[in-house]
């Protein structure tokens, strides 16, 4: 039976960068890897309402730099930067090394697979019909300029006794083309009928210059601009 390869893993080093950027000897590798996992687990839990898509971890000499990609940076920063300072101290306690936190804003959350999947999950948990949630996500992505999108939902849809799988696609989603910029992510909705899985593929276009033409880390927004978002989301 044929299986699909992971779209992100297949493109690593070709048109996609890693989410953990560091080198280690074999003795410390497992310890650092577990530290990365604990940091991501902590941030996902603390920033559950901040629409966090990616967490990139870099490890310069005896320190750690965490870049948080969020559609709502004001929630991450908090009042006068208090929340981000608490996050920095907590990560320092987890890793045992000095921590620097950068925040990158996601300008078009409709084109981010993780945020689209999380949005569908929140609708399913609010008992909105799954077909309506799928079509709304597809329409929003295509309106924002996506070349193609596919959404797949599996589980006890509508509370039926037998689990099934349904999907909806619009445009092109070329999974086998390595230069195709495919955003892929998954999320889970916990409903009264059980867990419903959501998968999202978004095709943004083709990258012809390879990985060298893509910035490894997006530039952090100036703090003055981030404070504007902070005031807006606090309202």
Curated annotation (Swiss-Prot):
A molecular function annotated in GO for this UniProt entry is: rRNA binding
Short name of one Pfam family for this protein?
Ribosomal_S3_C
Annotated ranges, domain KH type-2: 39-107
Which SUPFAM superfamilies does the entry link to?
A: Prokaryotic type KH domain (KH-domain type II), Ribosomal protein S3 C-terminal domain
Q: Which residue windows are transmembrane per the record?
A: none
- Please name the PROSITE patterns in this protein's record: KH_TYPE_2, RIBOSOMAL_S3
Superkingdom of this protein's organism: Bacteria
Q: Which GO terms describe its cellular component?
A: cytosolic small ribosomal subunit
GO terms (BP aspect): translation
Keywords (alphabetical) are: Ribonucleoprotein, Ribosomal protein, RNA-binding, rRNA-binding
| Function field | Binds the lower part of the 30S subunit head. Binds mRNA in the 70S ribosome, positioning it for translation.
* NCBIfam families (alphabetical): rpsC_bact (TIGR01009)
State how it assembles. Answer: Part of the 30S ribosomal subunit. Forms a tight complex with proteins S10 and S14.
Similarity section: Belongs to the universal ribosomal protein uS3 family.
Protein's name in the database: Small ribosomal subunit protein uS3
* Species annotation: Buchnera aphidicola subsp. Baizongia pistaciae (strain Bp)
Q: What is the lineage of its organism?
A: Bacteria, Pseudomonadati, Pseudomonadota, Gammaproteobacteria, Enterobacterales
